Amino acid sequence: MMSAARTVTVGTATAAPGTIVRGAIPVTTLAGGTPLEIPVVVINGARGGPCFWVDGAIHGDEPEGPLACQIAMREIDPAQLAGTVVLVPVMNVPAFEAAQRGNPLDTFSYDMNRIYPGRANGYLTERMAAAHAEAMVANADFEISIHSGGAHSFLDKAIFVDESPASVELATAMGPGWGCIMSSFNPKGSPMAHMKDSGKVGITVELGGRSATSPTEFARVGRELANSILNILRHYTMYPGAAAYPSPRYKGQQEALLAAASGLFLPAPGVGFLTMMTKGDAIARITNIFGDTLAELVAPADGMIFGLRALPNVTTGEWCCFFCKVEGTRD
């Protein structure tokens, strides 16, 4: 039997059943007297059900999450919703304002996605993470954290899970095209890891980045992510309509490929994202300024590319490619 609808409070936002309320999770006050708070939107359904929590911009140079949250907020009708959707468009507000990966106000815990859930009495970013984590764990049943390639790369549809059946189910509910489902490379320090440690479910999803921020491409990426938010609601029978699913679904591990030389990074003709490759297939080459090949990047195993650097100029040791080493299918 469906549970009765209830009033939901997240930070300063208190939403009665059937309403949408904006608010914030308070953190502290900055030196100039400006309050530091994390914005939230609570969409509380007219009927009872679970709480789905969506996080964006834990990295400030990844604006795709905020756009997806905007679209979802416009399109989800609380009168038709069973349960609650909590949208956190921007987790790391100072980083987002500076369009940087981490918090420019914090030297020691710069990257929130490595120190989460932080400490209530810790460095500034740790305090932000702790305030967010307290609110999330108190309310959420399952969560997605939206990422992208940020300022340095483009990442296509890829998901990290903790390999529990519940996390793989949530990943599958992202919908068609989201078949690259990898084991988490970061078992601690992220919202999804904290959700698991709290007996709940979270996943990390990747789509977008520097090569897809032209107006048309950025809008497309935001639309794709919003579609997945709605598809998840349908999968868990929180919203009307039938969910759709990816096929095939792959199981794999991430490997980062780094530059062996400095120069121009030139992907191989026809190389594509989320397309199966054989170990040794050409991914890219690095040339000097005269066009001489200095190094080649090849597939380290059978698998697929899900991320490539956006800047052609490259220095030895810089990141070039994210590769999913496919271990088989999940079907």
Segment roles from a protein language model:
Residues 1-331:
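Structured catalytic-domain cores with a bias toward divalent-metal coordination
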